[in-house]
Amino acid sequence: MSDFVNAISEAVKAGLSADWVTMGTSIADALAKGADFILGFFN
């Protein structure tokens, strides 16, 4: 779960500094980590 929080934090920091490429990749990373976390409950 901490990886998910870190990915969200990176996306927010990138957004605040208008680093759109980093923000986009951080959001994608957060979504992937969140999906992995949720799917972990079903395995």
UniProtKB/Swiss-Prot annotation:
InterPro entries: PSMbeta
Pfam families reported for this sequence: PSMbeta
GO cellular component: extracellular region
UniProt-annotated location(s): Secreted
Protein keywords: Cytolysis, Formylation, Hemolysis, Secreted, Toxin, Virulence
Signal peptide stretch: none
Gene Ontology MF terms in the entry: toxin activity
Main localization category: secreted
Residues with the N-formylmethionine modification: M1
Family: Belongs to the staphylococcal hemolytic protein family.
Name of this protein: Hemolysin H3C
Organism: Staphylococcus cohnii subsp. cohnii
